[in-house]
Amino acid sequence: MTRIKINARRIFSLLIPFFFFTSVHAEQTATPAKPVTVEAKNETFAPQHPDQYLSWKATSEQSERVDALAEDPRLVILWAGYPFSRDYNKPRGHAFAVTDVRETLRTGAPKNAEDGPLPMACWSCKSPDVARLIQKDGEDGYFHGKWARGGPEIVNNLGCADCHNTASPEFAKGKPELTLSRPYAARAMEAIGKPFEKAGRFDQQSMVCGQCHVEYYFDGKNKAVKFPWDDGMKVENMEQYYDKIAFSDWTNSLSKTPMLKAQHPEYETWTAGIHGKNNVTCIDCHMPKVQNAEGKLYTDHKIGNPFDNFAQTCANCHTQDKAALQKVVAERKQSINDLKIKVEDQLVHAHFEAKAALDAGATEAEMKPIQDDIRHAQWRWDLAIASHGIHMHAPEEGLRMLGTAMDKAADARTKLARLLATKGITHEIQIPDISTKEKAQQAIGLNMEQIKAEKQDFIKTVIPQWEEQERKNGLLSQ
C-alpha cells in the first residue's frame, strides 16, 4: 500500500493530475479586493512580476497543433452538423489563445462585424480584454452580437488580469491578489455555495481556474455564458438541468437528435476526484513554486505537465519515483481511452441507424425516446472525454460516466432495431468508410475545400484589418 506523506496544508492523494489546467499564483490574501480597472496588456506587469511574466510568456513553447479529428475520425460523425466536425485541435499554450480562436475553422469566415456562425461569447475565455469590455460595457453590452464584432477588441492573450486584481496596490507590491474577473463565474460559484470572497485561499486558487476550465452554455437571446450548475455539478445534474430548460447546442445532421456539446469541464471533474476532495489545487500540480537564478521562489506560470517539475509537484507528497507514477498515469489513461472508443463506436452506429429509421418514415413520436437516449449517451461520453486530464483528475468518475454512456447508447440501439424492424428493415445498417478525418467529413456532406478556402481568405483579409484597428486604438503594447 502506498505510503503518503502528510503535508502541513492537507493530505494529498495517490494520484496526480496530468494534463494542462489553467491556474493561478499560489500566494494570495484570503479576500482580494474587486478590480477597479482592467489593464489587458500583459506586458504592463512584467516589471512588477518579471519571473511570472517570463514563465507565462514561455507558454509560446507549447506550440504543437495536434489534430484530434485526424486521431479519431469518429468524432466527425458524433458532431455532424456542428462546427467541431470541421476542426478540433488539442489545446496549446495560453500564448496562442487568441490566434487559435481566430484561425480555427469553427469560427467561420465572417466578412463583417454582423457576419459569421458564432456569438461574441466564444471569446470569453481567451483574453483579459474580455474583462475589460465587461467592465466598460457591462455583460449585456459585451455579449450582444456576433463573434466577429470582438475581433478588433479581443487582442491580448489570456493573462494577468484574467486571474489577478491588477489594479490592487497589493498586486503592485508583488502579491497575487486573485479575483474572478468574469461575473458569470462568480454567480456560478455562489450557486454551488462557494462565494469567492468567503472561500479559503486554496479554494480560491482552483476557483480562478474554474472561470474557464468548466462546462458552460450560451443562454438566452444574447447568448451569454452560463454554467449549468443550478441542480449540481455531476453529469446527471447538468443533464437534468439542460433537459428541464429544453436546451440543445445543435441538432445532429444524421440522427436529427438535439445534442449537447460538453466544453472543458476540468473544474467539475477535478472536484469529483480524490485531489479535489483533498483540496490539492490546480497550481500544486500545474504551476508549482520554482526558484529563479537568485534562488528566490516564484510561481511558475508556464502551465503544464507535472512531470516536467516532478521534484516540485508530485514528489512533495508521493514517495514513488517518477517512472512508477508515470506508469500509473499511462494505465489510467489507457483504461479511459479503451472505453471511450467503445462508446464512440456505439454512438456512430446509433446516429446512422437513426438516420435509416427517419429515412424509412419513422415519426417524431417514434424517434423521441431513441433520440433522448442518444442525447444522454453522447452528453455523458463528451463530459468524460472533453476534460483531457480526467484519467488523473477523476479516473473513477470518468469510467463511471463512460459506463453509463455505453448503457444509454445500447438502449438507443435496441430501440432502433425494434423500430427498424417495423419498417421492414432487418439487415445491418451499413456505415460508410470513416477511417480518416477526410472520409468522415465527406460522409456527412462537408465541403472542406470550400470551408478551408474561405477561412484562408478571412485570415489574409479580415484579420489584418482587425490588427490595424488594434494598433490604432492602442490595445497592444507593440
UniProtKB/Swiss-Prot annotation:
First-level EC class: oxidoreductase
GO cellular component assignments: outer membrane-bounded periplasmic space
Residues involved in heme c 3 binding: 94, 209, 212-213
Residue positions binding Ca(2+): 215-216, 261, 263
EC number: 1.7.2.2
GO molecular function, one term: nitrite reductase (cytochrome, ammonia-forming) activity
InterPro entries, A to Z: Cyt_c552 (IPR003321), Cyt_c_NO2Rdtase_formate-dep (IPR017570), Multihaem_cyt_sf (IPR036280)
S-S bridge residues: none
Residues where heme c 4 binds: 282, 285-286, 393
Binding residues annotated for heme, in chain numbering: 122, 125-126
Reactions performed catalytically: 6 Fe(III)-[cytochrome c] + NH4(+) + 2 H2O = 6 Fe(II)-[cytochrome c] + nitrite + 8 H(+)
Pfam families: Cytochrom_C552
Residues where substrate binds: 216, 264
PANTHER family from the UniProt entry: CYTOCHROME C-552 (PTHR30633:SF0), CYTOCHROME C-552 RESPIRATORY NITRITE REDUCTASE (PTHR30633)
Family the entry assigns: Belongs to the cytochrome c-552 family.
Protein name, per record: Cytochrome c-552
Species name: Escherichia coli O17:K52:H18 (strain UMN026 / ExPEC)
Taxonomic placement: Bacteria, Pseudomonadati, Pseudomonadota, Gammaproteobacteria, Enterobacterales
